[in-house]
């Protein structure tokens, strides 16, 4: 047990070890709800500057750590950050998200993409992750993250976020051959990027397939799942002991399929009751989630009740407490503090299943 005592709490739970309470972190825990972040944003208005200048990205990543001591500290970045390294020019517009300047619509454009060389294209990622590991030591788990092939393809083909995804669905259903070529190239690049993050200090990596919930289950099986598997298989070949998390927004219809991806942990959103998620996924699949981010607008008693409800339903093994998606920018900062305080005071012995 000597090794376990110095292994951070979240990493132990993610590996399936028995812990005394669920570890807790929050998606988008570094962000606009924090005054410290808003102050820094005034000095660095460009998202790419905030996420790619190492000293700034390190400071942002550590803001929630210094304020709340979550069990996970995640790299401050964006899922589209590696795209320029493949030859896909992009920017991140404040409040609007990624913008792809020349959306990929033709065979020629896809042929021109080149393999990702992270040491050349993304050296700042190594600097940031090494600094985070150095700062938190064994007191917290450092998380990296990547976008999934379908979701990055959706941005690259649409040119920006979309409500209908009509352009990429047009490609998927009328010219699937070139989309499969793009998805393959993206999967291989994402695997390289995830390995680079792990080699740079990430102890757990989460893959965001944010837009795969826009697919029917049969199309998920064609355009999302095989490429999630391709990424995870490549990462596991070289880093078999690094826990991998998969998140799909709006995943209620594909939850069981997510467990087939090769991920160690399935992130569950609030549209599925955690007890139902556990029943659907089976006892061997670890889970993350799944409070509605809006719960943090409620009273302290309401927040506490919802935390306890989720933890009871998830049970005392293989659960990482989190929101079902990112914390909302309008969330009162003191409620986030209360969420973390309450979660860290829990003990499975005192939470009746």
UniProtKB/Swiss-Prot annotation:
Residues at which substrate binds: 28-32, 78, 155, 210, 325
Species of the source: Nostoc punctiforme (strain ATCC 29133 / PCC 73102)
Pathway membership, UniProt: Porphyrin-containing compound metabolism; protoporphyrin-IX biosynthesis; coproporphyrinogen-III from 5-aminolevulinate: step 4/4
Protein name: Uroporphyrinogen decarboxylase
Quaternary organization: Homodimer.
Statement: the UniProt record of this protein carries the keyword Cytoplasm: yes
CDD domains: URO-D (cd00717)
UniProt KW keywords: Cytoplasm, Decarboxylase, Lyase, Porphyrin biosynthesis
Role summary: Catalyzes the decarboxylation of four acetate groups of uroporphyrinogen-III to yield coproporphyrinogen-III.
Catalytic activity reported: uroporphyrinogen III + 4 H(+) = coproporphyrinogen III + 4 CO2
Site (Transition state stabilizer): 78
InterPro entries per UniProt: UROD/MetE-like_sf (IPR038071), Uroporphyrinogen_deCO2ase_HemE (IPR006361), Uroporphyrinogen_deCOase (IPR000257)
One Pfam family of this chain: URO-D
């Amino acid at each position: 047990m000597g090794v376990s005592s110095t292994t951070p709490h979240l990493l132990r739970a993610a590996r399936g070890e028995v812990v005394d309470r669920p570890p807790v972190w929050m998606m988008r825990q570094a962000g606009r709800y924090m005054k410290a972040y808003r102050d820094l944003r005034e000095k660095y208005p460009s998202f790419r500057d905030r996420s790619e200048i190492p000293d700034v990205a390190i400071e942002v990543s550590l803001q929630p750590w210094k304020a709340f001591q979550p069990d996970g500290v995640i790299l401050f970045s964006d899922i589209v950050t590696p795209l320029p390294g493949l030859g896909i020019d992009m920017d991140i517009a404040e409040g609007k998200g990624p913008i792809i300047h020349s959306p990929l619509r033709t065979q020629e454009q896809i042929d021109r993409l080149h393999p990702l060389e992270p040491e050349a294209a993304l050296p700042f990622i190594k600097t940031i992750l090494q600094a985070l590991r150095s700062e938190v030591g064994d007191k917290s788990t450092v998380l990296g993250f990547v976008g999934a092939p379908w979701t990055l393809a959706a941005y690259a083909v649409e040119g920006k976020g979309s409500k209908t995804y009509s352009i990429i669905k047009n490609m998927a259903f009328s010219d699937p051959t070139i989309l499969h070529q793009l998805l393959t190239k993206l999967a291989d690049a994402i695997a390289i990027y995830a390995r680079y993050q792990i080699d740079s200090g990430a102890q757990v990596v989460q893959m965001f397939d944010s837009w795969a919930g826009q697919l029917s289950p049969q199309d998920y099986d064609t355009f999302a799942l095989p490429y999630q598997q391709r990424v995870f298989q490549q990462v596991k070949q070289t880093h078999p002991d690094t826990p991998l998390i998969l998140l799909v927004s709006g995943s209620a219809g594909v939850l069981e399929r997510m467990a087939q991806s090769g991920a160690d942990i399935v992130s569950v959103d609030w549209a599925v009751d955690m007890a139902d998620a556990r029943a659907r996924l089976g006892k061997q699949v670890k889970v993350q989630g799944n409070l509605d981010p809006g719960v943090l607008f409620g009273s302290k008693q309401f927040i506490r009740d919802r935390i306890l409800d989720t933890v009871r339903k998830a049970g005392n093994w293989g659960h990482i407490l989190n929101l079902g998606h990112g914390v909302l920018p309008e969330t009162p900062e003191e409620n986030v503090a209360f969420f973390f305080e309450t979660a860290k005071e829990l003990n499975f012995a005192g939470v009746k299943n």
